[in-house]
Amino acid sequence: MLNAGGAATNGDDYTDCPDLSLLTTNHDIRRQLFTTVTGTSPATAEASWMAAQLFKEYPGIWPETVRALLIHSAKWTDRMQQRFNTDDKKTSGRKNLLRSCGYGIPSLEKAMWCKNNYVGMVVEDALQPFKKEGGTYKMNEMNLHEFPWPTETLESLGDTKVRLRITLSYYIEPGPGDIGWKDKYRYPSCSLRFDLINNNETIDDFKKRVNVKVRGENKKDSGEGSSGSERWYLGSANRDVGSIHSDFIDSSAVELCNAKFIAVYPVNGWWR
């Protein structure tokens, strides 16, 4: 969300108010040089300006990465939390917060630091999600990325609270109109998801959990350990919509020592 002015209300209706609007140049300078504007138009312009600054700072960066950096830098204000996240539960308050305010207000300064000297890792990568075997299409690749954790440093911090945030941004090709909209898998060409290894998993167990292809003959062998889904603030049911997914874990530093691997894998789309 970005500040684009406000409206005045009497409790029953709303109206534009110059004092709460943003100043801009007028389209007809013969009549007047300046005017006011409010709503989504100036908010869109500000978001575009922020994206342009990132492109300028880091030439060659992917558009998907620019979007990810802006979302990754966003934060909900206390007022947003108070109004929309009334019970702080994934199934209600946090869900309502995400639907009403998105991921919050982005910070251009923090977005730039994420590429510069903020503690973050940016990966620009690609995968082939599906392959054809005979007359059917099946899941193909997943990517596994390792965090360069300073394990000793995290261990030395002990119970100090830290936050790990992951943002996945990618391009989808919208479904052609002649395909129709029979179900939720028909609009995106392919969707992606991310998952983080849990403290009680080995790397082999983690691969088995997220990728059926590595399970061998026993396809029900999802490995030992658990997904640790309760660790996430939003949870997969809330974040896994659209083509950008962002979530975070608040944990002690020592508990994150072994959270070194993240998997990015495909799910259904109309390409398949």
Residue ranges and their predicted role:
Residues 157-272:
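Long mid-to-C-terminal assembly/interaction modules of large eukaryotic proteins
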